Amino acid sequence: MKETSFWGETPSLSFADDTDKPLSDRTASPPCDPASSLQTALDTAAAQGQTTRENVLSILRRHLGSGNATVRREFEKRRMSGIDAARALARQADDMVCALAELAAQKHESPGETLCLCATGGYGAGLLAPFSDIDILFLIPGDPTPAMTARIEFILYALWDLGLRVGHATRSIAECVRDADSDLTIRTALLDLRFLHGERGLARDLRCALGADLQNDRLCEFVMGKIAEREQRHRRFGDNPYMVEPNIKEGRGGLRDLQTLNWMGRAALGCAVSTPDRSGQPAEAPQTPSFASFGLLTDRESLRARRSWDFLWTVRLHLHYITGRAEERLTFDVQPVIGGRMGYATHGRQRGVERFMRHYFLTARDVMRLTSVLQPVVLMHLQDQTTGEPPKVVPGPEEFQTIAGRICPIEPVTFAAQPREMFRLLDCGRRHDLPLHPIAMQQIIRNERHAVTLRDDPETAKIFLDLLCEPSADETKAVPFWLPILNETGLLGRLLPDWSRVVGQMQFDSYHIYTVDEHIVEAVRMMGQIEAGRMADEIPLAYTLASDLRSRRALYVAVLLHDIGKGRGGDHSEIGADLALTICPQLGLDPEETDTVSWLVLHHLLLSQTAFTRDIDDPRTILDLADTIQSPERLRLLLLLTIADMRAVSPKVWNAWKATLLRELFSRVAEVLEGGLAATERDSRVNHARELARDGLTGILPESSIDRFLDLGYPSYWLGFDTDTQMRHARMVHDSDRYRSPVTVEAYPIPERGVTELTVLCADHPGLFSQIAGALAVSGASIVDARIHTLSDGMALDTFWVQDGEGCSFEEPHQLGRLNHLVEQALSGRLDIRKGIEDASHHSTSRRMRAIHVPPRVVIDNTASDRHTVIEVNGRDRPGLLHDVTSALSSASLQISSAHITTYGMRAVDVFYVRDLLGMKITDPVRLARLRETLLASLTSAPVTTPAS
């Protein structure tokens, strides 16, 4: 029989292995009972008269260390589940607390006084992570006497001496009730009250008092407070559960969300997602029944809830043990380690760490779905309890109903028999500006598996396209962004089978901060924002193009499908283009739209790769691009797709400089598609640029200086800079001649483009680029582009566009002065570049980023340019990388004409247009092979050595 999952029948998943089985279902070999051996050791010590505090602490410390080591060993050998290990650690702590409480009662007798020790919070729930606090409540009848205070202090100081992290409070029952009324955190911690030692009656009375107090308005206030607290926590730790370095405890879909469901359920309904360990509780404390036992969860949902608890606790314990601290963030450096320990190996093209993280993200999604299923039950029960009547239901549009202004189905059971009604409900909400009621979300989640029958249904396809193409760009409306709802409920994966392959799929790099499915959802949202004009100030060209779309449906579907091929392995652009040919007709697109979508998906990286890694001043670059695109309409659509894609990768990926490059590339290709860039026109442009420069310089510089400057530049120079920049260059040349300066450096900020333009004028010589790159590396500047021009008099006029560590321009005078000074020092031989780079390297890459592997790669292309050999170098980004690579090029006797520098997280892609000393391409196979070896060597952190001739 096919295995059923939380939400229905599940296909065989590529990440499923032994870890997909609930850990609690595996054969476990629990360690020996530490409590009995501890008591034996204490009894033996007492019989021998070794009852001093130091003697007892030595015994406790030895047993605590031995017990914790046993738990860790059994857990890491995968003979104990995460839940079982957490319970064992809690029992270890119980043994320590109870032994010290017993000793304290003997050492500090206080006749007539009663004391009750209770565990609270997560420790009270009987679960403890290796480096978490143990929270203890010292419950007393009234004000503590000096003897009672000494007794409590004895316990606390001893626990601290044992190295335990202790959170504690000393309160009476009345104080507990009072503080719980005023503090949500205290109220929550006391929900997990668990008796440890002393007077049981106090614990029983406190539980009764808290239960009597948590009724009606206070109960409603508590539940709504936990919901608000959860939303605030999500905003703080990442509202998106699919960020690639999630917080497994506090983030959305993490352990705290499951605990919140437990707290709300127990307070409002007397049941919980899972039953905590109540060993050691007094007999009068009944076990909390589960939601499933009340019929509030299906068997599939209950199974998935238990697996989620187990999986998240297992990950959390590994995280604590590996880092040696109470670490809750699943960072890049620990992900492969935990994945390996949990048995995730590489399968095909998918790495073990990616399979592990996909399992994590699918678990987080299950937790969010569980919240959507259970929270409506709790809230509706609260309303019944506080008002005495059910919520007011009024007829809604199109045979639906509304509850508190939110749309809801009249008969949820109809979704199973008529799955199209789920899409009709969403579409009705879209057209009438009605958000979904939680009950609607609950029922869609429970019935989404029936949507598989709608894959060839034209009406469903039409509704889906309407939902896709209206991504709630108007923030004044209360309606949601519909695509995340389709994704989170599972409807999208049922409608488009290949979508389910990218759900929860991460890419183990520091460039993409979202999983593939969440990145696509964000890209569609970004497309809606562009079209609505909310980014008109930032990207005016995109808004202008979006306001006159002729192929709107094709564009939105292309955004939806542009990365869907990543679920199959291989070239995702080619795979996605093929998938589009099948998916588009299924969605009701006509043949022309289908062809457009497939073409856009195939080429969705074309503009960005060309703009950031090719010389757009080279006519061959523009002509080849125009030959591929062919149509002005396709160029417009491709630019919009490119912008939406880039903006959805990460907030740090998009910047003003990249916007400038894309805009310039777009305008040049558009001009060619309209019939421009003929050779004769190129000559006239050069002459026109020279005349504009002359007109601008007249009256500023002597005529002789103007004539000299106009004779210095070659055609590529006059076509590569605007008139204002050329006028600045003319003044630099004039000042250099006037003052006979061997080196002239000028840093000019261009904040609207997000870069600082650094221009260097000096005698051309081998290694010049490398020296400047080294100086800039020492300064902390990142080079994003460079143009190298050798003037007709043999002087080099090199221009570098640089950014600071945040991707912005250098603007402060002291920053600009430092850039100039370091470059001048490097060119005069007064700067130790290697030492400066080594110093910068000590403060660069964090340990978590070093876990990301970036394979070195060198690609040499003699077809991309008519006059240059184009060399693309891929490697791990680090301070001085560009210096090392350009040193290697210089040692190979190559001249760099332009360089284009791009980083994708930790991966640097540096592209150089080079020629030999005679100005020719490099074509000799032996020389090319040697060049490739030299460049590969330069991609390591070792200094570059000059290759043998």
From Swiss-Prot:
A Pfam family assignment: NTP_transf_2
UniProt-listed CDD domains: ACT_ACR-UUR-like_2 (cd04899), ACT_UUR-like_1 (cd04900), HDc (cd00077), NT_GlnE_GlnD_like (cd05401)
Keyword annotations: Hydrolase, Magnesium, Multifunctional enzyme, Nucleotidyltransferase, Repeat, Transferase
GO MF entry, a single one: phosphoric diester hydrolase activity
Transmembrane segments: none
Residue span of region Uridylyltransferase: 1-395
Description of how activity is regulated: Uridylyltransferase (UTase) activity is inhibited by glutamine, while glutamine activates uridylyl-removing (UR) activity.
Renumbered residue ranges of the record's region Uridylyl-removing: 396-756
Entry keyword Nuclease: no
Swiss-Prot/TrEMBL cofactor(s): Mg(2+)
Region described as Disordered: 1-37
Domain HD as annotated: residue spans: 516-632
Residue ranges constituting the ACT domain according to the UniProt record: 757-834, 870-949
InterPro entries: ACT-like_dom_sf, ACT_dom, HD/PDEase_dom, HD_domain, NT_sf, PII_UdlTrfase/GS_AdlTrfase, Polymerase_NTP_transf_dom, UTase/UR
The UniProt record lists the keyword Transferase: yes
Catalytic reactions on record: [protein-PII]-L-tyrosine + UTP = [protein-PII]-uridylyl-L-tyrosine + diphosphate; [protein-PII]-uridylyl-L-tyrosine + H2O = [protein-PII]-L-tyrosine + UMP + H(+)
Any one biological process term the GO annotation gives: regulation of nitrogen utilization
Domain description: Has four distinct domains: an N-terminal nucleotidyltransferase (NT) domain responsible for UTase activity, a central HD domain that encodes UR activity, and two C-terminal ACT domains that seem to have a role in glutamine sensing.
HAMAP family, A to Z: PII_uridylyl_transf
Family assignment from sequence similarity: Belongs to the GlnD family.
Role according to the record: Modifies, by uridylylation and deuridylylation, the PII regulatory proteins (GlnB and homologs), in response to the nitrogen status of the cell that GlnD senses through the glutamine level. Under low glutamine levels, catalyzes the conversion of the PII proteins and UTP to PII-UMP and PPi, while under higher glutamine levels, GlnD hydrolyzes PII-UMP to PII and UMP (deuridylylation). Thus, controls uridylylation state and activity of the PII proteins, and plays an important role in the regulation of nitrogen assimilation and metabolism.
Entry protein name: Bifunctional uridylyltransferase/uridylyl-removing enzyme
Source organism (scientific name): Gluconobacter oxydans (strain 621H) (Gluconobacter suboxydans)
Gene that specifies this protein: glnD
